[in-house]
C-alpha cells in the first residue's frame, strides 16, 4: 500500500505541475474579501445565519464582483444543483446588489477522489474523524451570537490546521478531500480571470475554504480580508420567486440525472449519487417556498 501511495503521489505531481503556471494577477489590484457560507446550515433558525443574513452581509460589502461556488461548466446547466444552494441564490440576487456574479469553482473527477479515499493512510483518517467530531461538538456548544462569528474566527483556525497540518499539499489525503489545494488555487485563478474592472471582489465559499484562499491570494501578492459580521440576525426572511424557480429547476434536473431521464457524463452521475444535494435543495425549498419575497 505504501508503494502504491508513492506512485499515486507521483502521478498527482505530474498532473499538477503543468497546471501551476505563472500565477494570475489582476490589474488594477482589487480589494478582496473572503466570506464563508454554511451550506445547509443556513436553513436552521438556531444558527442565526440565514440566506437573508448572507444577503445583508454581501450587500454591506458593496462588491463589484461576487465569486461563487459553482464551476463555470455547471453554471445554469443540468449540474448546477450539485453545488451549494446558496451559490445559485447569490447568482440570482447579484444584479439587485449591483454586482456581477462569476462561477469560479473547480472539481476533480469522482473516480480519482474515490480512489484516494481508499488509499488514504488510516492514521490520517483517524485524525480527521476525531477532528470532525471535536469540531461538531464545538459548533453545538459555541457561545458566539451567530454561526457566522464562529466560522470566521475559530472555524478558520481549525480549517487551516486540518488542511495544512493534518492533510498537507500533494498528498493522497489532499486528493481524498477533492484536491483541496489545487481546487483553491484554481478558484483564485478563476476569480482573478473574471476580475476585469472590479475594484472590490467578494469570494463567497464554504467557510473551510477561507484559509487556503487567503494563502493562494497571498502567493499572488494580494492580501485578502476575512469578512467581519455586518448584519444583525434577522430571522429566515424570504427569497425572490426567481430563486425558488431556480432551485426547483436544479432539483428536478438532479432527480432526472438519478433516474436516467437526463443524460450526463458518468463522472457527473457519480458525483450526484455520492452527494446530498437533493436533500439540501428540498430543505431550501421547504424553508423558503412559503416565504418568497414579492417582486
Predicted regions span which residues?
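Bacterial N-terminal signal peptides
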Residues: 7-15
Amino acid at each position: 500500500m505504501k508503494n502504491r501511495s508513492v506512485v499515486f503521489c507521483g502521478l498527482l505531481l505530474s498532473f499538477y505541475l503543468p497546471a501551476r503556471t505563472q500565477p494570475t494577477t489582476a490589474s488594477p489590484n482589487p480589494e478582496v474579501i473572503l466570506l464563508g457560507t454554511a451550506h445547509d446550515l443556513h436553513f436552521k433558525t438556531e444558527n442565526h445565519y440565514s440566506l437573508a443574513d448572507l444577503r445583508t452581509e454581501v450587500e454591506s460589502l458593496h462588491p463589484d464582483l461576487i465569486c461563487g461556488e459553482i464551476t463555470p461548466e455547471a453554471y445554469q446547466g443540468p449540474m448546477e444543483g450539485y453545488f451549494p444552494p446558496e451559490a445559485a441564490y447569490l447568482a440570482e440576487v447579484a444584479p439587485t446588489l449591483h454586482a456581477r456574479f462569476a462561477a469560479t469553482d473547480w472539481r476533480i473527477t469522482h473516480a480519482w477522489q474515490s480512489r484516494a479515499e481508499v488509499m488514504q493512510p488510516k492514521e490520517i483518517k483517524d485524525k480527521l474523524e476525531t477532528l470532525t467530531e471535536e469540531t461538531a461538538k464545538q459548533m453545538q456548544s459555541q457561545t458566539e451570537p451567530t454561526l457566522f462569528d464562529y466560522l470566521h474566527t475559530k472555524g478558520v483556525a481549525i480549517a487551516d490546521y486540518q488542511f495544512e497540518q493534518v492533510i498537507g499539499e500533494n498528498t493522497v489525503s489532499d486528493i481524498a478531500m477533492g484536491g483541496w489545494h489545487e481546487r483553491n488555487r484554481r478558484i483564485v485563478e478563476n476569480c482573478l480571470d473574471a476580475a476585469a474592472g472590479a475594484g472590490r471582489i467578494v469570494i463567497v465559499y464554504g467557510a473551510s475554504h477561507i484559509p487556503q484562499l487567503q494563502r493562494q491570494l497571498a502567493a499572488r501578492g494580494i492580501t485578502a480580508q476575512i469578512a467581519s459580521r455586518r448584519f444583525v440576525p434577522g430571522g429566515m426572511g424570504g427569497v425572490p420567486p426567481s430563486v425558488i424557480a431556480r432551485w426547483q429547476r436544479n432539483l428536478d434536473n438532479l432527480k432526472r440525472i438519478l433516474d436516467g431521464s437526463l443524460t450526463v457524463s458518468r463522472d457527473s452521475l457519480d458525483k450526484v449519487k455520492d452527494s446530498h444535494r437533493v436533500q439540501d435543495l428540498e430543505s431550501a425549498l421547504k424553508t423558503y417556498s412559503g416565504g418568497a419575497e414579492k417582486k
